[in-house]
Amino acid sequence: MSIVIGADAAGLRLKEVVKDFLEKENFHLVDVTAEGQDFVDVTLAVAAEVNKEEQNLGIVIDAYGAGPFMVATKIKGMVAAEVSDERSAYMTRGHNNSRMITMGAQLVGDELAKNIAKGFVNGKYDGGRHQIRVDMLNKMG
């Protein structure tokens, strides 16, 4: 499993904080950030890498998280969540089988961002009654 991470200019500093944290937690990271990328481009790059392997997860950071979330939800088969708290990050994996989260550097601080990332990457899909919803999401295009 790889954690694919990317950021636009507004999210660069926080991306490095999250990236360093996850690397210290022994996760394999793939950073697709390129200089001057808009949130649309970076979200598409993260999604492309996430979709290479079923177990891959993605994190996109910009100023507010809303833009990358909107882009991610346009990608067929991508279940994404915009999060700004640890519980939502964990639960979106458990109940929605989300493969990508977005967050805003102007909304969350360093410690909260690390905890959000930790909750997301450590979350496990519960399946069962949640699968009906996940199937519905995956059929949307």
UniProtKB/Swiss-Prot annotation:
GO MF annotation: an example: ribose-5-phosphate isomerase activity
Keywords assigned by UniProt, alphabetized: Isomerase, Lactose metabolism
InterPro entries in the cross-refs: LacA (IPR004783), RpiB_LacA_LacB (IPR003500), RpiB_LacA_LacB_sf (IPR036569)
The UniProt record lists the keyword DNA-binding: no
EC numbers: 5.3.1.26
Pfam families reported for this sequence: LacAB_rpiB
Catalytic activity entry: aldehydo-D-galactose 6-phosphate = keto-D-tagatose 6-phosphate
Pathway in which this enzyme or protein is active: Carbohydrate metabolism; D-galactose 6-phosphate degradation; D-tagatose 6-phosphate from D-galactose 6-phosphate: step 1/1
Main EC class the enzyme belongs to: isomerase
A GO biological-process term: galactose catabolic process
HAMAP family per the UniProt record, alphabetical: LacA
UniProt subunit comment: Heteromultimeric protein consisting of LacA and LacB.
Record-linked PANTHER family: GALACTOSE-6-PHOSPHATE ISOMERASE SUBUNIT LACA, RIBOSE-5-PHOSPHATE ISOMERASE B
Protein family (similarity comment): Belongs to the LacAB/RpiB family.
Protein name: Galactose-6-phosphate isomerase subunit LacA
Chain's gene name: lacA
